[in-house]
Structures are given as structure tokens and as C-alpha cells.
Swiss-Prot record:
Family listed: Belongs to the acid ceramidase family.
Post-translational modification: N-glycosylated. Proteolytically cleaved into two chains alpha and beta that remain associated via a disulfide bond. Cleavage gives rise to a conformation change that activates the enzyme. The same catalytic Cys residue mediates the autoproteolytic cleavage and subsequent hydrolysis of lipid substrates. The beta chain may undergo an additional C-terminal processing.
Subunit structure: Heterodimer; disulfide-linked. The heterodimer is composed of the disulfide-linked alpha and beta chains produced by autocatalytic cleavage of the precursor.
Entry function: Lysosomal ceramidase that hydrolyzes sphingolipid ceramides into sphingosine and free fatty acids at acidic pH. Ceramides, sphingosine, and its phosphorylated form sphingosine-1-phosphate are bioactive lipids that mediate cellular signaling pathways regulating several biological processes including cell proliferation, apoptosis and differentiation. Has a higher catalytic efficiency towards C12-ceramides versus other ceramides. Also catalyzes the reverse reaction allowing the synthesis of ceramides from fatty acids and sphingosine.
Highest classification ranks of the organism: Eukaryota, Metazoa, Chordata, Craniata, Vertebrata
GO cellular component term of the entry, any: nucleus
Record's protein name: Acid ceramidase
Disulfide bond residue pairs: C30-C339, C387-C391
Residues of the active site: C142 (nucleophile)
UniProt pathway annotation: Lipid metabolism; sphingolipid metabolism
Broad enzyme group: hydrolase
Enzyme Commission number: 3.5.1.23, 3.5.1.-
Tissue distribution of the protein: Widely expressed.
GO biological process, one term: cellular response to tumor necrosis factor
Length: 394
């Protein structure tokens, strides 16, 4: 009986969200004049921190964690509570704490040692830090956009939507984990020899990267891709000893840190075996250098590129293959395209991209931050977001 009630609630919620996708107040006309960020959809700036790559991996995050450890403990405790709600025996978390630390040596450098350093400084068990990093392989719902204006200038924008089904606060209509991630959101300037190697926006405690750019070379964001051959299978294979695939957040960071051109980045992201199916959204600095790479775990299915000579002056990627319809209760693609077409190619700027990313349901209850990247000018900025009621849950 309880199962029937839950199913009825889920179906009712789905129908409500499906209807809300198409009608105000959960959708709206394309926003204008939202930039510079202000007002009720703007939570505040994302703080900057430097990560010194010349330090041993174990020590790189210590200075940042001295400030952010309490907030990280709150988030990890929330995730643990959610897991224990579904597995009340506590056996799953016991396995996490007992089994995962033994696998730290199988992680590629420098990620294992960085996680070990994070665990020691925060006092959070190493197994939970590892699971916290796995967690980002599975729950990333995002919108990414690359545009090219009439002069061939490229811009890259993204909304980071995270935390779906990870605890709903009925008192203020927010996702628990989404809200707890906002104090942990940081801009990171990764430096070597006191010079910037790359910049990224990420969450404290996570050593992979999901959003970043290499000034003057390329920009990169990652969106989750739903597939039957999904990330859970990749994680299980890794836990049972198969180590031939890379974690998606690790390969993104590795490309940002080590790759020296747009074409090299595209080649790596297209061919490397990965643990979870994803979309890599990659932008460069020259006309036509922008693409969405649709990945299965072991192969690339599609590389969809800018083609301004034939009228394709933007690419938009949410969490669905471009050749398929979106899920009927989650269509962010259509309003994003509508607003870009309304903007027109001649009016592209940080301001107009931010307007698109501020329009419901592209902006929704899962949106943690918005990032804007200009590779050519070396501009990178991120802003914490809110979506006050009435606002769709995803």
C-alpha cells in the first residue's frame, strides 16, 4: 500500500511538472537586463582561491579546507543521512568506510593523495571523501552553451544544476544538497610557478573538475548523460577491479591541466575510456571551435560542432542526446534555444548569455551557479544563483 502511495505521488508530481514546463509562472519570456547579476535570482559572488600545483598533492587543498571544512562536514553528513534512509541497516556506509580506502592506491596521480589530504585535514573518513567524489559522477544536471558572434568571437556559458532527488526541504521548497553546495562553491586558480595553468569553478572536497578554462586556449564543461550503460556500471566495475576507464571529473581536470590546444583536448575527450556516459562541451578561440561530444563509456557517439557559415552559430546541451526528444518533464533545451534565437547572433555577450541562463526553466531549483567564459579575453566568472518561487524543481 505504501508503495502504491509513493508511485501515485511520483506520477502526480511528473504530471504537474510536465504541465508546468509549458505554462507560466514556471516558464517565462526570455529574461532581459539581468546582468550585471542582481535581484532575487542572484545569491552572490563565488570566492576565488589559489591552488598551488607546486605543492605535494597531499597539501594542495589544506589552506582552502581550513576555511571550508565545517561546511563540507555538513554536506557529507547530509549525504550519509540520505543513504541511511534508503539503506537503514547502515551496511552501505559501513562498506564505504571499510572498503573504499583500500582502493585509493588504484586512483591515478595526483587524485588519491589529494583525497587523502582532504580526509586528514577535515577528519572526514577517507571512504566518505572517495564516495563524495564518486557522487559527482552521477547527479549532474546542467545546461551548457557555446556561441559565436558575427566576428567569430566565442563565448561559453553554463548553469550547474546539481542535487536532484537528494532531499527536498518542504519548509522553503529547495533541494537540501543543492543549498548545501552553495557555501562550498569556489573559483579556483590552479597555478604552477606562480602562473595560471587553468581556472575552474568547483565544490570544496571534489578533486575532479566539471567547469573550467585554459586562458587563450579552450573552455570545457561537462554534463551528465543518461544511459542504460550508465555510471553505476562503471563505478561497480572499478570497485571490482577493472581500472581501464577514467573518472569523468578526473579526465576533465587532466585535460584542463595538461592539454595545450583545442584539437588535442577534443581528441582526448573523444577517445578516452570513461566511467560514466557524459557530454563534453568544448570551446576554443577560433571560428568554428566549439562542439558537444556525446560519450558512451567506451566510445564517442557524436561530435556536434559549430558551423557559422551554415547558420549554426550556437550549440546547446542539457542532459539529452540532441537527436532525441527531451524528457517531457524536463525541457530546458527548447527555452534555451528560443532565447538564443531571440537574442540574435549580433547581440551575443556575457550579458545576453546570462539572460538566457536566467530564464526559467533553464534556471531552476537545482541551479547552484552560472559560469561565463571568454577564452580569447581570458575572462572567467561564476555567480551563485537562486530560483525563488514559483520555480520548477528541475
Amino acid at each position: 500500500m505504501r508503495g502504491q502511495s509513493l508511485l501515485t505521488w511520483v506520477l502526480a508530481a511528473a504530471v504537474t511538472c510536465a504541465q508546468a514546463q509549458d505554462v507560466p509562472p514556471w516558464t517565462e519570456d526570455c529574461r532581459k537586463s539581468t546582468y550585471p547579476p542582481s535581484g532575487p535570482t542572484y545569491r552572490g559572488p563565488v570566492p576565488w582561491h589559489t591552488i598551488n600545483l607546486d605543492l605535494p598533492p597531499y597539501k594542495r587543498w589544506h589552506e582552502l579546507l581550513a576555511q571550508k571544512a565545517p561546511a563540507l562536514r555538513i554536506l557529507v553528513n547530509s549525504i550519509t543521512s540520505l543513504v541511511n534512509t534508503f539503506v537503514p541497516s547502515g551496511k552501505l556506509m559501513k562498506m564505504v568506510d571499510q572498503k573504499l580506502p583500500g582502493m585509493i592506491g588504484s586512483l591515478p596521480d595526483p587524485f588519491g593523495e589529494e583525497m587523502r589530504g582532504i580526509a586528514d585535514v577535515t577528519g572526514i573518513p577517507l571512504g566518505e571523501i572517495i564516495s563524495f567524489n564518486i557522487f559527482y559522477e552521477l547527479f549532474t544536471m546542467c545546461t551548457s552553451i557555446i556561441t559565436e558572434d558575427e566576428k567569430g568571437h566565442l563565448l561559453h556559458g553554463r548553469n550547474m544544476d546539481f542535487g536532484i532527488f537528494l532531499g527536498w526541504n518542504i519548509n522553503n521548497n529547495t533541494w537540501v544538497v543543492t543549498e548545501e553546495l552553495k557555501p562550498l562553491t569556489v573559483n579556483l586558480d590552479f597555478q604552477r610557478n606562480n602562473k595560471t595553468v587553468f581556472k575552474a569553478t568547483s565544490f570544496v572536497g571534489y578533486v575532479g573538475m566539471l567547469t573550467g578554462f585554459k586562458p587563450g586556449l579552450f573552455s570545457l564543461s561537462l554534463n551528465e548523460r543518461f544511459s542504460i550503460n550508465g555510471g553505476y556500471l562503471g563505478i561497480l566495475e572499478w570497485m571490482f577491479g577493472r581500472k581501464d576507464a577514467q573518472w569523468v571529473g578526473f579526465i576533465t581536470r587532466s585535460v584542463l591541466e595538461n592539454t595545450t590546444s583545442y584539437e588535442e583536448a577534443k581528441n582526448t575527450l573523444t577517445k578516452t575510456k570513461i566511467m560514466a556516459p557524459v557530454y563534453f562541451i568544448l570551446g576554443g578561440k577560433k571560428s568554428g571551435e566549439g562542439c558537444v561530444i556525446t560519450r558512451e563509456r567506451k566510445e564517442s557517439l557524436d561530435v556536434y560542432e559549430l558551423d557559422p557559415k551554415h547558420g549554426r552559430w550556437y550549440v546547446v546541451q542539457t542532459n539529452y542526446d540532441r537527436w532525441k526528444n527531451t524528457l517531457f518533464i524536463d525541457d530546458r533545451r527548447t527555452p534555451a534555444k528560443k532565447c538564443l534565437n531571440h537574442t540574435t547572433q549580433k547581440n551575443l555577450s556575457f550579458a545576453t548569455i546570462y539572460d538566457v541562463l536566467s530564464t526559467k526553466p533553464v534556471l531552476n531549483k537545482l541551479t547552484v551557479f552560472t559560469t561565463l567564459m571568454d577564452v580569447t579575453k581570458g575572462q572567467f566568472e561564476s555567480h551563485l544563483r537562486d530560483c525563488p518561487d514559483p520555480c520548477i524543481g528541475w
